[in-house]
Amino acid sequence: MVIGLIDVDGHKFPNLALMRISAYHKARGDHVEWWMGDLFHYDLVYMSKVFSDAYSPDKPEPLNADKVIKGGTGYHIHLRDGKEYLDDSHADLPPEIESMRPDYSIYPQYGYAISMTSRGCPRSCPFCLVAPKEGRKSHKVADVSEFWTGQSVIKVLDPNITACKDKRDLLRQYRDTGAWIEFTQGLDIRLLNDDDIADLNSMKLKNIHFAWDNPNDNLAEKFRAFSKKKCS
């Protein structure tokens, strides 16, 4: 089969779903490439988008494919009274694709690994779609080795790893890679304990920041306590 991929959001950041889809089809012996236009025939084309139409307008469906599959959070976000909502039709990737190690070769311009080792968040912030999409309990979904193939930098996409009951295991897995770790999502200072700080201090940290989603929360004491043991 000839498989075409369309990253509707553009190529400013690797699309994890498309990387897994590519890995799955290549493992089956299919030819996978970025969709090249309507001059070429494709057996199947995948269109994926993370962001809503407000940020990533949809693209016309290919006319030269036997089948087109459109997926990703961006196709299921709707605006109501100025607020984004996720509809109930959103579906995860099939387990046989979700379990694939990402195919980094489709994004050669990026030399880092990306990982999503836990999903869900207990905070349910009104501006965030993680809780309705992934649940209000942070839970481990993968090991770091399922994403990392020796890259010197790992960008961690976990929405709230500090809320995960398996965070000790996950943080130490990241540490043990010896790679530079970049937490792309804010860590939750309210859930950080001494063991967490020790694990963070033992990593090669490229970037770390904290989510302060409710300005009415007085977290000054938490930040003062953290600063005394802050990561180097």
Outline where the language-model segments fall.
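Short, charged, surface-exposed secondary-structure boundary motifs
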Residues: 15, 43-45, 57-58, 77-88, ...
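Flexible, charged surface loops at secondary-structure boundaries
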Residues: 37-43, 62-65, 108-109, 146-151, ...
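Ser/Thr/Gly-rich flexible loops in soluble cytosolic domains mediating phosphotransfer, phosphorylation
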Residues: 66-102
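Conserved acidic residues
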Residues: 42-45, 126, 152-154, 206
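Canonical Radical SAM [4Fe-4S] cluster-binding loop centered on the CxxxCxxC motif
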Residues: 107-146
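A short, structured N-terminal alpha-helical element that caps or precedes a catalytic domain
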Residues: 1-70, 74-77
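Conserved SAM/AdoMet-binding glycine-rich loop
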Residues: 147-232
